Amino acid sequence: MSKCIVFDRDGTLIKYVPYLKDPKQVELLPFVKEVIRAFKNKGYKLFLHTNQSSISKGLFSIEDVKLCNNRLIELLDLEFEIFNEICIAEDYDDITGYRKPSPKFGKEILQKHSIIPENLVYIGDSILDIQTGLNLNCKVFGVKTGIDLRKFENHFFYTKYFYNDLVQIKNRIIQK
């Protein structure tokens, strides 16, 4: 049976930059490349889910976000396809239903890839990421690399697994 991991982007895989629209500002967080490689080598399907409401506010375009996503993939510099799918939630008012903490994208992954919730992992740096995973009844991991750290620590009870970086999360997931 397939196993899947959904990653948040900003603050989880790349350094948080407010209103990121310039691919030159995309910077991988430590160990991201090694962690992605390890999960792919273990057969995990990987997905990216990012809230980008600034698109609907007119601050930047969907193309800007796609260019930043492409830069992330370029920086990973891996010899295989990294993400099975990428979801960009661009609506501030969630017209499409994809804005976190909505479980819509995760439910589509479960259905499309014949996954059970127990084989889906959601990893992020914010309360919205954790709530999204909880709404999916899947495994949830918080990483202390984003800007929501203080809020996140106040809500540590939202997840059983809360770690300093992605390496600690990878070790916890792969050891099972």
Where are these predicted regions, by residue range?
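Active-site neighborhood of HAD-like aspartate-dependent phosphohydrolases
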Residues: 1-47
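Non-catalytic pre-domain segments flanking phosphatase-related domains
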Residues: 1-7, 165, 169-176
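Metal-dependent phosphoesterase signature
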Residues: 10-30, 55-63, 78-80, 91, ...
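Substrate-recognition element of Asp-dependent hydrolases with the DxDx(T/V) motif
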Residues: 32, 36-69, 83-94
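Short, electropositive alpha-helical surface patch
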Residues: 58-74, 98-110
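Structural recognition of alpha->loop->beta junctions
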Residues: 69-88, 152-173
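Conserved Lys-Pro-Asp/Glu-containing loop-to-beta segment of HAD-superfamily phosphomonoesterases
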Residues: 100-127
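Acidic, Mg2+-coordinating phosphoryl-transfer loop and its flanking beta/alpha structural elements
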Residues: 122-158
